[in-house]
Amino acid sequence: MNTLTRDLVKLVETAEQSQKTREELSVSDRKFREKLHLMPPVGWLNDPNGLCQFQGIYHAFFQYSPFNAEGGVKMWGHYTSKDMIKWEYQGTALYPDQPFDCHGVYSGSAFIEDGKMYLYYTGNVKLEDGEYDYIRTGREGNTVLVITEDGKTFGKKKELMRNSDYPDDLTCHVRDPKVWKENGTYYMVQGARTNEDVGQVLVFESEDKVNWKFRNRVESEKPFGYMWECPDYFKIGDKKLLSTSVQGLEGGIWEDRNVYQSGYFEIEGDILGEYKLSEYHLWDYGFDYYAPQSFETEDGRRIHISWMGMPDCEEYSNPTIQTGWQHCFTFPREIFEKDGKICQRPIRELEEKKHLVSDVKGMLAGEGYPVYEMTISDITKNRFKVILSEKLILDYADGKFRMHFTDQDKTSVSSGRSMRYVEVEEVENLKILADTSSVEVFVNDGEYVFSTRYYPEVYKLQAEAVGAQITLSEIM
């Protein structure tokens, strides 16, 4: 540990203790703290990093700026869990304390092998003044490796690749390494932006997890956004999926969507050679969802977690900024295939935490439940409506499922959020997972998902679906 690291450790611990004391003294300052969703102890959280299960324990690292609830220099915060429900904060794992990551320990992934956790990330270096997320030169995106044998103490950082090691037709935007092993060889994908402002994913290969060679690039037939970041490659059944968050989609259907999108392509062929990409499928149609990352559990499930936020969004915000923190993760989701479609559902561990409150037909009303799951099943009529906390409405009519707020003022429940929707021929079932300040909605067994933050004054709910079964369970 060098002098800079020691100073950063003290500063972070001081900021965290100050926030803890503040919330102990003020109920209003902890009002919107979540029960199921991971949040920063203080300051800002964004991308999930290094998601894995290591020696039976789940690890979730996160982009962490403890000194500013609106973002700042990035480091890796660290949580662990035995069940992905109850998490324990382990402190800051990685600090920006080396010449090759001095302006931020940016996003990356974990790879588990031989009793060790290999953490790969992008070390950010800013060489000149400017809007670093948008300029084409003037910054470094270095690929860095750290190894831990116990998930608690982290070894010496090793710089693996620099800008000069990437193809020369790229801007300075190469980042977010995700690593896996296949047929005895190690592979890495990274997001990239070309000099022509075209987004793509780079594929590297290695025989030893340290020395990497560029192998291929994956891109759409026509330009699709100017940057593809946070790439992830995995298989669900026989389907090969390339997940990536895309910046720069404009016009057409994207006008009614978020600033940036997160979704996946199905791959026909081989990303190491000849391939064909499907159309781009969104992971989530709601307001707050970006930079997802997946990992495989020891029992073979593919788990998916995202930042429950949206970068560069001027339309809406979060009032928790005023109380010293901002953002959370989505609740962990299992990705699965049903009838040829990729779907998502809350992890099965949640079932043990549910306590039945009501199970009725057609209509339900309740109050005083900030953390709950509601399901509507056996929907036979092409119309239903759910009202949460008086101003968040989920409804289906005329082939369109909508999530919309009746009050879009930035001081209201919505904090500026308006409406998101998807066209669905038929809705058969609905699952709502609500936390103190977030809602996730799973339509048709998770074929479509909507995520949003919300900030209620009262916790009320009403549901009307003629002939359908409505079940409400409190989550303890």
Predicted segments with their positions:
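Beta-rich carbohydrate-recognition and catalytic domains
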Residues: 1-176, 181-224, 237-285, 308-357, ...
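Beta-rich accessory regions
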Residues: 18-24, 260-476
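Catalytic nucleophile loop of clan PA
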Residues: 110, 233, 294
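Repeated scaffold domains used in trafficking and secretory/extracellular systems
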Residues: 228-231, 290-292
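Juxtamembrane/interface motifs at transmembrane-helix termini
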Residues: 234-237, 470
